[in-house]
Regions:
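Active-site and donor-binding regions of nucleotide-sugar-utilizing enzymes
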Residues: 4-155
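Loop-centered beta-sheet repeat module
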Residues: 142-175
């Protein structure tokens, strides 16, 4: 069965590849959803494609309606995976895909930067109106946190409550 990696930035692409190497995951699918189309995003996506069985990419946030349709169509193609691994579980795109794709295990990964801010983006679990409209309550960010089975991070200190695997910064940057 396939493993699915949802990435939003070039750094996410590198982290996902580091996870694949460290865990020796086989048969992986990449969904890359950058918010802008530039040379850097295209370059890293092109470099990453060779490590995945199937890849998908779309620039998001240009039209939420088109994005919503794209995510639904994408979920119909992927259907089910063993591991669902998201670089940012809080975004609507990750949670919408998660609600539509059958999976056995939920994993997350981050660079740890959010832990250095006084009021981090990820600490706010209040659901935005768009999430309340499009997602069932069990796919609200606050509900999903307890379902994460494994979390990969660069952050050296206590992170989240789930089983955490620390990635070495150099292994990510050398990907």
């Amino acid at each position: 069965m396939n493993n699915l990696f949802i990435c939003y930035t070039p750094f996410h692409l590198n982290m996902a590849f580091s996870i694949i190497k460290k865990m020796k995951y086989k048969s992986n699918i990449l969904v890359y959803l950058p918010s802008i189309g530039n040379k850097k995003n295209k370059y890293y996506y092109k470099q990453s494609k060779k490590y995945y069985k199937i890849t998908y990419s779309k620039i998001i946030k240009l039209s939420y309606i088109k994005d919503f349709i794209y995510i639904h169509n994408l979920a119909k193609q992927i259907k089910d995976v063993n591991i669902f691994c998201a670089g940012n579980l809080k975004t609507m795109y990750s949670r919408l895909l998660l609600s539509l794709i059958k999976h056995n295990r939920l994993c997350t990964f981050d660079d740890g930067v959010g832990h250095y801010y006084k009021s981090p983006y990820f600490a706010n679990t209040k659901e935005k109106i768009i999430g309340r409209i499009f997602l069932r309550k069990n796919f609200y960010y606050s509900s999903l946190l307890s379902k994460v089975k494994l979390h990969f991070t660069l952050y050296p200190n206590k992170n989240i409550k789930h089983k955490t695997i620390k990635l070495d910064y150099n292994s990510v940057c050398d990907s």
